[in-house]
Swiss-Prot record:
Lineage: superkingdom: Bacteria
Family: Belongs to the LutC/YkgG family.
Protein name, per record: Lactate utilization protein C
UniProt gene name: lutC
GO biological process, one term: lactate metabolic process
Phenotype reported upon loss of the gene: Cells lacking this gene are unable to grow on minimal medium with L-lactate as the sole carbon source. Cells lacking the lutABC operon exhibit little or no defect in biofilm formation on MSgg medium, but form small colonies that almost completely lacked surface architecture when glycerol is replaced with L-lactate in the MSgg medium.
Length: 240
């Protein structure tokens, strides 16, 4: 991923300091240690299986089907879920995990031979990727981090993993490795912060997706699918 550049940072910060009527503080600034941090108490001590139960229960509330399987059953589980969503066209990011999880033959041979088009995101194709996403019935991605408390999958966008894959198709499927499940956004933020400390380039676009698209008015009338997929499903892979 290309590292971005920051422009006019110094003049911007100097202007803020000037507006506050003081000089810039360039040293001795530290993150405070708060006496109370309740965000870490929620779901504290929950085992991996406990977090799966929390995730399953919340998926019911967000109108998202959760299918449990393992690496051996993932091929059939994904095939069946796409069928329940009325088939393709299918769009996927360029992600080596599809092959690692035993899905290459499904995506490159089996579905295409049955008349189900599969488009793999190609950075060199530019706008054509977005058109394919608009035409797709199902978008499939992996969840990088999964929040049990809210039933949220976290996606890291890149040149090979376009945001359109999970946004524009009519339906969406997230493949959720069990190892990706954490209690809540607190832990997800810690993971991202640690990546930064380790020198890992953080994506410019990080998406927190909680089931299908939802929108509500002041009278709390819920409408699904206004600005994203109408239906969503998570396939939990228990041995990953």
């Amino acid at each position: 991923m290309t590292k971005g550049t920051i422009q006019n940072q110094e003049s911007f910060l100097n202007r803020i300091a000037s507006s506050l009527g003081r000089e810039r503080r360039t040293g001795g600034v530290a993150v405070p240690e708060w006496a109370h941090q309740p965000q870490y108490k929620t779901l504290e001590g929950y085992s991996a299986d406990d977090l799966v139960t929390v995730l399953k229960n919340h998926c019911v509330k967000i109108h998202t089907e959760l299918i449990e399987t393992d690496s051996t059953g993932l091929y059939d589980a994904l095939r069946e879920q796409v069928s329940r969503f009325s088939g393709g066209p299918v769009i996927i990011p360029k992600d080596p995990r599809f092959e690692e999880y035993g899905l290459k033959s499904l995506l490159t041979k089996d579905w295409p031979s049955e008349g189900t088009p599969v488009w793999e995101w190609d950075a060199d194709k530019g706008e054509e990727n977005i058109k394919k996403a608009e035409q797709a019935n199902v978008g499939i991605t992996f969840s990088e981090i999964t929040l049990a408390e809210s039933g949220t999958v976290v996606l890291f966008s890149s040149k090979d993993i376009g945001r359109s894959v999970s946004l524009l198709p009519t339906t969406y499927i997230a493949i959720v490795p069990k190892s990706s499940i954490v209690p809540r956004m607190t832990q997800a933020s810690d993971i991202i912060r640690q990546n930064i400390a380790n020198g890992v380039t953080v994506p410019s676009c990080i998406n927190y997706i909680t089931g299908p698209s939802n929108s509500a008015d002041i009278e709390m009338d819920l409408v699904v699918g206004v600005h994203g997929p109408v239906k969503a499903a998570y396939i939990l892979v228990s041995d990953r």
